[in-house]
Design a protein with these regions (language model features):
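Carbohydrate-associated surface elements
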Residues: 215, 234
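A conserved catalytic-core segment of Leloir-type glycosyltransferases
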Residues: 42-126
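Nucleotide-activated donor-binding/catalytic signature segment of Leloir-type glycosyltransferases, i.e.
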Residues: 290-297, 302-328
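Acidic anion/phosphate-binding donor-loop and adjacent secondary structure
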Residues: 74-79, 235-254
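N-terminal subdomain of nucleotide-sugar transferases
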Residues: 1-75, 228, 280, 436-442
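Conserved donor-binding/catalytic core segment of Leloir-type glycosyltransferases
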Residues: 250-268, 274-277, 427
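Membrane-proximal helix-turn-helix segments that form the acceptor-binding/catalytic region
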Residues: 130-133, 152-155, 159-163, 176-177, ...
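Acidic donor-binding loop of glycosyltransferase active sites
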Residues: 207, 315-317, 331-348
Length: 442
């Protein structure tokens, strides 16, 4: 079967784990069935906060994977922190995410914000463009896709499109200058102007732009004449092929599992929820006996401390990073899935990747964040759960009580609406249709 070829420039690729990997691994998995051969360009030695070798099985045999070494400033940063006596946890946390920054971390933030533009992967831009120009001369493709962050991937895509004349899609998994941590990077005014100029250059230079959230799509469309498409993240039906766990619907002899999967950052710590659970445990011995707080993925130590300080240490199960399939199993066994957003105004526009796998788990979802944000719209539309403000203690108590009562009766179900539009197969079909439009000959 003849297939067109698409070059996908992505920093994240298996065996690296995490949500940043899964979007384009899943697209690559299903693109061949839509007539497209994926050619992935990715670093040989990326920074890996999580490793999930199981994702390598998702990459189709027809895919071509090109790997080149990258200079990683974060490795030098970690060595300096270790030598200065920082804890293992502090060393592993990106300085952007560190809450109580040491002087060394503050210096690292300034260096990262002003000397590495647009991000610490900028040292890969020039070598990548030179390598890919030579590669494409010998192995032509029909289309280029860059996916960011890191935004350096878009800089590679921009220069490559300019020098080859190929159509190019800039896929934004997160915004650029409107991402929550942008304002924390301690940039000079000149650096901030440079970022806004380059963001505009990428948006205008792309043949098409893809956003994963409707609010980000709208924001980008006000900034450029380039068409901005909405193609969200999603769930892979193959990951959910087994029958739902019967125990997940509850019963008086079954544990009441409140589960969070993925990165759990300190600035998304739902302290009010821990207070609600603590008070209910004190008032209801049966609830205390059956409550399990399951945390899967990288969890900030401040969150673990907050849970223990609330008297919930015996109920806590900190499982760490699990392979994707095991994480999904735990989601499906949950009584309640929690999705606290970071306490940043920019998160109103965010649709976390885990949201869609939460939907496919058919469990009730308690979101904590802006009640008028993008995530709230999805949960309302699918009737899969609710989003409450961070400090709305009474509403959280009522929702936990409601889920607990349904759990005891074995009636705990969720996601009544249609979620088929979020399946990876349907999303890949839409992406392939965009590919076809951009490469159609007049």
């Amino acid at each position: 079967m003849f297939m067109k070829r698409v070059l996908i420039i992505s920093y994240y690729w298996p065996p690296t784990g995490g949500s940043g990997v899964q979007r384009w691994v899943k697209f690559a998995k299903y693109l061949p069935s839509e007539g497209w051969q994926p050619v992935i360009y990715t670093p040989e030695n990326p920074e890996q906060l999580a490793v999930d070798a199981s994702l390598e099985a998702e990459v189709p045999a027809v895919a071509e994977v090109l790997k080149r070494r990258i200079v990683e400033p974060y490795e030098l940063y970690k060595k300096v922190l270790r030598r200065s006596g920082h804890s293992k946890e502090a060393v592993e946390v990106n300085p952007v995410n560190a809450q109580n920054k040491s002087m060394l971390q503050k210096i690292a933030m300034w260096v990262r914000g002003n000397l590495f533009r647009p991000d610490p992967r900028c040292l890969w831009i020039g070598p990548s463009v030179r390598y890919l120009k030579k590669y494409l001369a010998e192995h032509p493709v029909d289309l280029i896709v860059s996916t960011g962050p890191p935004q350096s991937m878009h800089m590679i895509g921009l220069r490559l499109a300019q020098e080859t004349g190929l159509p190019w899609i800039a896929d934004f998994r997160d915004p650029w200058t409107k991402i929550f941590y942008f304002k924390h990077l301690q940039m000079t005014r000149a650096t901030e102007r440079w970022h806004k100029k380059m963001e505009k250059k990428v948006l205008d230079g792309a043949t098409a732009v893809v956003a994963v959230s409707p609010l980000v799509q709208q924001e980008f469309q006000t900034m450029t004449q380039t068409p901005v498409e909405l193609i969200t993240n999603g769930f892979d039906e193959c990951d959910f092929h087994a029958e739902p766990f019967a125990m997940a619907y509850g019963g008086p002899a079954i544990d009441f599992c409140i589960t969070h999967t993925g990165l759990f950052a300190a600035d998304g710590n739902p302290t009010v929820l821990w207070d609600v659970l603590s008070e209910k445990c004190k008032a209801d011995a049966e609830f205390r006996k059956h409550l399990k707080i399951n945390l899967i993925g990288k969890t900030d130590e401040q969150i673990l401390k907050a849970i223990c300080d609330a008297g919930l240490e015996e109920n806590l199960m900190n499982m760490g990073y699990l392979e994707h399939a095991r994480a999904i199993d735990e989601q499906r066994k949950a009584s309640l899935l929690i999705l606290p957003l970071r306490k940043e105004p920019e998160y109103k526009a965010v649709l976390p990747g885990k949201l869609f796998e939460y939907l496919a788990s058919w469990r009730p979802v308690l979101g904590i964040g802006q009640t008028d944000g993008a995530m709230s719209m999805i949960l309302q539309d699918t009737k899969a759960g609710i989003v409450l403000e961070w400090e709305d203690k009474d509403a959280m108590r009522r929702y936990v009580d409601e889920c607990w009562e349904k759990h005891l009766k074995g009636e705990l179900k969720a996601t009544e609406g249609d979620i088929s539009r979020f399946s990876r197969i349907n999303l890949t079909r839409r992406m392939a249709q965009l590919f076809d439009r951009l490469t159609a000959h007049p």
